[in-house]
């Protein structure tokens, strides 16, 4: 009886192995990982968020906004581009003894967006946002894909910054390209939350000048066709060339679609 059981078991195993040999390649089960539910979904790029910080040296709460930005930069790294735009009623243009960081273009931006207080931010230009809400607003924007991938280089030579911007669109796009020069590590006066004035406050990502006009230049992109723009910016003698960077972003009435930042080398 035991011998018959062994023979039956061997026969069943042989049948199973033989059956497997007859499964066609196109009938085999294959594990598919991360298969998209919608194969025709358009390709997108990872979004880099632009935070325009409208600040001022006479603004006692603006250092609090800076602290939020530092926390966001630590959390998100290069995916957040912060720009300190000095101007408005609490901006300071300087005196013979004290360095000022406010600019006429900063004043123009402040007025254009109908801002009423400082610090206040624009997150991808989706309305004025109080600094206490920046973290949530940035997180929300980062969850949104972008239809454009951007690249940027900035090279210093002979007192000029040579700038090259490239866009790779995954959809047709019409809007504007804006390019700015920023400077880090500027030691200058700042009013503090405790009511004191700190003459040795270090200001970072300070907007120094727009490169291609106050509101940038028109840009039209066609899906699948890369575009590139080149421009130069003269270096102001007051700037520390070792602390300069360039920011480029594309925007339209729907907000900022993509941003990128690169150090000046």
Q: Where are the regions a protein language model picked out?
A:
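Bacterial Sec-dependent N-terminal signal peptides
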Residues: 2-7, 15-50
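Short N-terminal helix-initiation segments at or just after the protein's N-terminus
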Residues: 23-31, 60-66, 193-195
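Membrane engagement elements in two modes
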Residues: 32-33, 64, 71, 103, ...
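Intrinsically disordered, low-complexity boundary segments flanking structured domains
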Residues: 36-38, 68-73, 109, 136-141
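Local sequence-structure signature of Cys/Sec-based thiol-disulfide redox active-site neighborhoods
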Residues: 40-87
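Short, conserved sequence motifs used for protein processing/export or organelle targeting and
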Residues: 84-265
């Amino acid at each position: 009886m035991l011998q018959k059981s062994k023979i039956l078991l061997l026969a069943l195993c042989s049948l199973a192995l033989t059956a497997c040999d007859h499964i066609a390649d196109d009938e085999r089960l294959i594990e598919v990982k991360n298969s998209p539910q919608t194969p025709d979904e358009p390709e997108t790029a990872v979004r880099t968020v632009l935070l325009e910080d409208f600040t001022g040296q006479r603004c006692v709460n603006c250092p609090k906004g800076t602290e939020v930005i530092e926390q966001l930069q630590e959390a998100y790294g290069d995916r957040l581009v912060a720009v300190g735009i000095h101007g408005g009623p609490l901006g300071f243009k300087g005196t013979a003894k004290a360095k000022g960081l406010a600019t006429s273009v900063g004043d123009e931006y402040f007025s254009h967006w109908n801002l009423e207080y400082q610090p206040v931010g624009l997150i991808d230009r989706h309305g004025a946002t109080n600094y206490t809400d920046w973290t949530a607003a940035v997180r929300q924007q980062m969850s949104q894909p972008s239809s454009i991938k951007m690249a940027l280089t900035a090279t210093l030579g002979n007192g000029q910054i040579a700038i090259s911007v490239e866009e790779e669109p995954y959809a047709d796009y019409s809007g504007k390209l804006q390019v700015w020069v920023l400077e880090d590590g500027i030691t200058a006066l700042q009013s503090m939350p405790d009511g004191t004035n700190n003459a040795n406050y270090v200001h970072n990502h300070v907007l120094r000048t727009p490169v291609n006009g106050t509101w940038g230049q028109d840009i039209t992109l066609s899906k699948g066709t890369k575009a590139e723009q080149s421009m130069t910016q003269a270096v102001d003698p007051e700037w520390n060339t070792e602390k300069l960077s360039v920011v480029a972003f594309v925007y339209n009435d729907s907000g900022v679609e993509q941003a990128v930042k690169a150090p000046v080398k």
